Amino acid sequence: MKLKTTLGLLAGRSSHFILSRLGRGSTLPGKLALQFDKDILQNLAKNYEIVVVTGTNGKTLTTALTVGILKEINGQVLTNPSGANMITGITTTFLTAKSSKTGKNIAVLEIDEASLSHICDYIHPSLFVITNIFRDQMDRYGEIYTTYNMILDAIRKVPTATVLLNGDSPLFYKPAIPNPVQYFGFDMEKGPAQLAHYNTEGILCPDCQSILKYELNTYANLGAYICENCGCKRPDLDYRLTELVELTNNRSRFVIDGQEYGIQIGGLYNIYNALAAVAIARYLGADSQLIKQGFDKSRAVFGRQETFQIGDKECTLVLIKNPVGATQAIEMIKLAPYPFSLSVLLNANYADGIDTSWIWDADFEQITDMDIPEINAGGVRHSEIARRLRVTGYPADKITETSSLEQVLKTIEAQDCKHAYILATYTAMLEFRDLLANRQLVRKEMN
């Protein structure tokens, strides 16, 4: 082993040992190690079978559900559970890996779309999974085709890897890559072809650029699409969700390829994440019983429908970061059969996306149909989100606003509702979790 690699390992692991005692250390150890040896990740990852999960929405939950299943097979699975998904976080993940008791080293990693190509200079995945691509952080990623091309550039570096795609997205039709491709998607009862419910990305037919119609439209531009001009249609699915048995604000049950599964996480959008996890697990050889066992042990992860108690109140923290994701979160809380207070926390740091105009494309109008006695607008851009919420027609006198997340927490405590939902952008979610962790209301995790 080269001296620079040895020094990198020493610096990275020593810093992780110290920082982990403080509930920190998911990126700095990797950053220190890379300063000594820029190729250290290649050395650390060389003996692993690697599954990469990327895409706009659903990376963290898809990864967590997959890891839960694969632990039933392998016992030990390397992953980055706190969502540190750039090269420093991925390097830290490998730096701190424990030896597998089975002798088989498996890593399931969520990786940032813009970082993936650079990271693939050092790792060689056997499977890439793309959950979806929607408009997100335009100041960082650009428009959706730019993001998609970033991902395809990474995949082309590993032409032997299989690529698992969301077949319900027209964007993923016939990708320009040499890799073998498989598709997952919803294959429930179809109806007459209609325009999408809402298509904020403006996706057109990938062959002739005509407007697409849908025989089944799950949400946004996803579903069984067809072009009536040229006949282009969704590809055949390798992994099919054929029935939605139950859908609530905190759980769902569904049938995939003849087997019924359930997760203790609400919302239609999260069923796509479960479907992707089933597809990954089956590709890697897991049977339905092991998949069920993994799902039975699953829980909401790191700000993705994470629940906690404040006194006698049951609270749920939900990450939002773009129009489609926010709209789906709103659809999910709409399923709650009880009144609840709502807090919406909007920051505009680099990790959130500095441009917050996306809030005007999210369907906040639905809140006027819910039993929400009070709303709290918080975060750096509290006045912006408060204005957006007032525009829905929700009574302005029932909206409080503050930049202080500590004050938001105190307000939730004082409100009468026994249930609360907190929708938060990424850095607001991290800050709010820190407040909760300091009160020991949630488990402190590295961030």
Write out the residue ranges for each language-model feature:
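Adenine nucleotide phosphate-binding catalytic loops in nucleotide-utilizing enzymes
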Residues: G185-P323
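ATP-dependent carboxylate-amine ligase
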Residues: M1-S15, L19, R24-S26, G202, ...
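Residues at the starts of beta-strands that form the adenosine-phosphate
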Residues: Q76, S126-L127, A161-T162, P180, ...
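Short glycine-/acidic-enriched loop or helix-start segments at secondary-structure transitions
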Residues: T62-T63, H118-I119, D139-R140, Y173-A176, ...
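Phosphate-binding loop of NTP-binding sites
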Residues: K2-L204
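Residue-level signal for inorganic ion chemistry
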Residues: E110, T131, L164, N273, ...
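Buried hydrophobic packing segments
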Residues: T66, L70, I90-F94, A274-L284, ...
